[in-house]
Amino acid sequence: MVVHQSAIVNQFSKEHKEKMGAYRFLNNSSVSSDAILSGLIHTCCKNASGRQHLLCIQDTSEINYEAHVERMKKKTASPGIVGQRQCGTFLHPVLVVDASSHIPIGFSSVKQWNRSPAALSREERNYRYQPIEEKESYRWIESGMAASEQMPRDAVKTIIGDREADIFELFSRIPTDNVHLLIRSVHERNCRLDDPDCSVQLNTLMEQAVLRAEYSFEVLPGSGRKKRVACMELRFERVTLCAPVNGPAKGSPPVSLYCIHVKEKSSSTPVNESPIEWRLLTTHVVETVEQAIECIGWYRCRWLIEELFRVLKRKGFMIEDAQLETVSALQKLILISLQAALQVMVLKLSFDKEDEKLSSEIYFTSKEIALLHIVGKKSEGNTKIQQNPYKKESMAWAAWIIARLGAWSAYKSQSIPGYITFKNGLDRFYTQFELYELIS
């Protein structure tokens, strides 16, 4: 699957017997999604060992199979639906990222589910007053607790989520001494002041907060944003959030944390674009500008999980084009594809960042690394510029070799190798590895 950078069985299996083997594996009831997920988590835990700080980034995506619904109905009476009542499954992984290098190292959990077409509506369920455990939004708490439990105890864990994760129960249940939250705020919450009988809305409080600093960062093009250097105004305050006045969290004790408000100045905001603006709620101590900017940097790592979804859906793996007939087979394929897509993505990231701290052992076996040494020597040219400049057995070193196998010239004047280059390089590498194993 990694070699052919596809989640479509007919594409990642060359021969008929390979295709039949893949179909039998995915449809084998004795091979569960839980067993595959357990392997992914074990790999992530191994990769996380010895790391001081882990960013555990949550997000949800829809995998839509509406184009194949008739095929699926042959084996499954009701394959389940996602948004817009279309056939599919929800995917909610927690991507674990090393906080110092900003390189992903695996998954601490992956949740998949869909809805019954006969499920009651939010109004019929009286959704606002349902216990949080009965809501789909409980996934944010459940996945946060799993990250806390699965990852090494001595590592600091920061659970990162976008606006959907702004749930009061998350703040009251998850944080410990070394498990922190960094969540983008969306709700207009009440904040308690020194006088317990007085409160003010969070947005009002932050708009009136003292301007702490101005700083800038580069915005890459995409998602309706133009490339630019965004000039930001930074504010932060310690706040005490009051429990909601309605719903299952009503009457809960208030929660004390920090709010970071960062907003782009009009001088750097392009015409017809809204300014970048984030209100981040965090349990990390934020008493200096440096601490606030560091938290913002961690939050900006959310682009990694968004990029992973793009790789999984469009840039090669095409998971929504997989033509399997059962939900269970598709969910197994999604798990396997996630790990394969991550390996391809990390190769490109390691090359782009020129990071020599990450070991290639995370994504390559010892035998594969031995072959990388052999192939790497042959991939180097006669000039200094065509020599692999990276520390041996680092991920950047491996990425340079794979890029060369993918027909990258090693000259800086040539464009940076992309996903297709790394796909082609991996294809050649694993073809050579099959022969290498036979010989050795």
Q: Where is each model-derived feature located?
A:
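Single, function-defining residue in the core of a domain
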Residues: 1-73, 81, 87-90, 95-440
